[in-house]
Amino acid sequence: MRPWLLALLLLAAGAAALAAGLSWTVRRRDLVRRPEERRVGFGFRKTLLIYQPSNRGRVNAIAWELARTLARAGHTVTLNVPSPVLTYDPAEYDLLVFGGSAYLGSVGRPLKDYLASLRFRGKQVLLFVVGDLERAPEMAGLRLCVPAGNQVRSIKIRPDEGKKLCQFAQASV
């Protein structure tokens, strides 16, 4: 076989593998998971924390760290993943928190769809995105899902900056 033909075949195989990997990542990002409500803390303020789990579990750990921090600050935190079957009424909560991982410039479709389906006004909303890149185009897409008339604060953190998110949340509430 000629060297240039072999190089061309290897290049095509590599491109196909990359495309398959990206497709797999996007499908995993947009996977609707089974809801499983957890409660953390017994405070006077009520917080709803909905997060899109990440493929590697980093966001799960960050969400739990944030829930424990808010509980220590006097919140009862209801923790769950986004799903069309959730029936939470945002009016019952003092703080609404939504977050997830950034993949290819966007957060998971289930989180955006769930957030866009909610109707609420006059609420304190905290958005967080976990990703490795400094730029945050995914935050703009997530912010567009929040109805007008709410106080929205947002932050993008790296996977190892859970404490930074917790400090941000404490300063925001």
Segments predicted by a language model, with ranges:
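Short acidic active-site motifs
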Residues: P84-Y88
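FMN-binding flavodoxin-like domain, especially the glycine-rich phosphate-binding loop
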Residues: R2-T47, R58-T78, P90-V173
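Cofactor-binding loop segments of dinucleotide-utilizing enzymes, especially the Rossmann-like FAD-
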Residues: Q52-S54, P82, V130-D132
